Amino acid sequence: MRKFCLGVILASFAVLLAAGISSAQQRFRIGYAVPLTGTFGRDGNLVKDAYTFWADLVNAKGGVEVKGKKYPVDLSFIDDKSMAAENAKLTEKLITEDKVDLVLGGFGSDSVFAGSAVAEKYKYPMISGSASSNKLFERGFKYYFSTLGKATEEVRGCVDIAQILSPKPKTGVIVGSDILFTSLAAEGYKKHAAQNGIEILLFELFPITLQDYNSMLIKVKQKNPDILFVGSHLMVAMKTIKAMKEIDFTPKMVAFSYGPTVPDFVKSLGKDAEYVVAASEWAPNLPYRDPFFGTAKQFNENYFKKYGRYPDYVEAASAAGAYAMQVAIEKLGITPPVKEPDRVKLMEELHRQDLATFYGVVKFGPDGANETHPPVAVQIQNGKLVNVFPKGAAEASPWYPMKPWKER
């Protein structure tokens, strides 16, 4: 009798264990490494919020719908501490030890460059909404995708805006930090400045660890440019504005490749953020929509309801990337646990994808870059980001020229 009871107990335990395993397998386990601390900690937390926003909405709707059945999403993330080598190591851990079904990209071209190489090695599709260095797309990779355009094109709106400014700017200075994205953004400024007839008086890259911004900008001030173009992340953009005020330097316009669209920029600088122009690839007034997030405006408002702040374009791009992966999974009928043949099919489907989203059309080229996403320029006016270029998408005219610091 004891043996019979023990057998029943063990059998019941085995059934429960199997049910638990089965239940775990009925969820998409998705992981990513992202900077939550260090130089890019604030930026990385935006990406984390974007993925969480997407996953929470998926789960609120019951899960990813495949062949009439819904599968919830489990997100796991690890802090790469703003170090590219750490991102590669953690991405490998997610794949080989944690055995996640899928991966997403972290933040920044350097870290994503490293992490995507690991994803390529293990044939894991990786979509990023926060890395756009041209070099990411020059490796012949099949498994890396970006909802952003290339860095050199991302800043085009910040230069092309000169076409509608009066008096038309004739000269510029380009500075930027010497890391992957920002140095290529600086090269993009140079390319588009030449096309717009803007003479570049100085081109200089500086260490990302630079502390003395005043001395660098005094050199820039001496050139007396109409426009200062900066290859930047959030930290660089904030330090540049603070130093410009300290040395009383006011060109007619200042433009940044990234930073001012992050809510912390205006929050930290207050009125000193006024007049600043920044590159962007999305704005909530644009006429984009999809059946999952709704319109660009609805995405913007719902994001505010969840986080108490509006998203920047990197958050929109990151959420759109996760959605693009979701749509491909649903179309292919992939169910968890995801196996290598499924991931190969997923990669192939992403290369075919031509998807209308709240963020705009997502259509990946052979190199993984988003081919159809036009860059825009935004400006901080009365504490808010306003789309000012191109004209067809603008909410307001650009404030130009900048008011001198002493007149504000």
Give the residues covered by each predicted segment.
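Extracytosolic ligand-binding ectodomains
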Residues: 2-16, 20-408
